[in-house]
Amino acid sequence: MKKKIRVLVVDDSAFMRRCLKDILENEEDMEVIDTARDGNEAVKKAVELRPDVITLDINMPVMDGLTALQYIMSLAPCPVVIISSLSTEGALTTFEALELGAVDFVAKPGGTVSLGIKQLADEIVSKVRIAALSNKELLSSSRNFKKLLKRRNQEVTRKVYENKISKKEIVVVIGVSTGGPKTLMEILPYLPSDFPAAVLVVQHMPPGFTQSFAQRLDQSCNLKVKEAEDKAFIEPGTVIIAKGGWHLVVERDSRSSKLITRLTQKPEETLYKPSINVTMKSVLENVDGRNIIGILLTGMGDDGADMMVEIRKRGGLTIAESQETAIVYGMPRAAVERGGAEIVAPAYKISDILLKKVNEYARTSEY
């Protein structure tokens, strides 16, 4: 018999604890081994019971979720799925939790909670399953990993390009899902302000969170980071975050022929919105393949893998995050297995690779 996923449910609301317990125990491969009503209880039970996954509320008495998360990651590292409020303040707190080691989050519904939480049952179950597959060794080593990154990148952030102005349109497309916010924080802040390429980031994320995510990244990066807008020009030295609930595509402006972003609901049938494949395909249709860099980071499934193959066929550079640092080695693995990854590297080396390659692209003669 297959081993069940052992879940610890943490929420200060008895009603929410009961709802989450019912949702999870309705699945044959899951069992709720215990519940906790505050962060203090959560830490004690995490150490004592060693669950496979914890669902964690943020706003709780005695000890809040963020404090509890730090103790859990230090004393009993475990994949954590945050159950968070869909408010501006809630979104910012959620990203702080993701940077501290939580692997994913589910937005608590507004209005009637009893109806809303049941509508989210499929999402909750799916994210708990994916969390159970995450690389637990990375959770326990996250603090040392961050220290290594800070040390290694002190000089990198001060690099200045000899060729600041390039006539080439160099576009970097990054696709990422579960574990993405933490991984992106290990790459984007180490790119200099004169980075001569535009960066498009497609992070699987629900509506209402990507604006706060872009703002948080903007505070940490040398590059300008913003949420995608319809009909906005794509400029070098800018990071554009795909808007939750919309596909991000690239087109040519009819007057200037410059690259612009478009937000669209089509195609409707994709599993994710935004979709990595959709964005990469549109970039391939509008930019010389030799000036494209495709990157696939941590995440479940295979979104982006097919287009990584196409980018490589057209002469672009493709990079897949290695299993060494991927929280969930799904999407990068798919790219590697399909022959879509020219380079396979841990997250902490990707900024260096980008700096080197984009500088080479910018300095070579025009095609």
UniProtKB/Swiss-Prot annotation:
Q: Which GO terms describe its biological process?
A: chemotaxis
| Protein family per UniProt | Belongs to the CheB family.
Molecular function terms from GO: phosphorelay response regulator activity; protein-glutamate methylesterase activity; protein-glutamine glutaminase activity
Could you tell me what this protein is called? Protein-glutamate methylesterase/protein-glutamine glutaminase
Q: Function, please?
A: Involved in chemotaxis. Part of a chemotaxis signal transduction system that modulates chemotaxis in response to various stimuli. Catalyzes the demethylation of specific methylglutamate residues introduced into the chemoreceptors (methyl-accepting chemotaxis proteins or MCP) by CheR. Also mediates the irreversible deamidation of specific glutamine residues to glutamic acid.
Q: Which positions carry 4-aspartylphosphate? A: D57
How is the polypeptide modified once translated?
A: Phosphorylated by CheA. Phosphorylation of the N-terminal regulatory domain activates the methylesterase activity.
GO CC, sorted alphabetically, is: cytoplasm
Q: Main site of residence?
A: cytoplasm
Q: Which gene encodes it?
A: cheB
Looking up Pfam families in the UniProt record yields: CheB_methylest, Response_reg
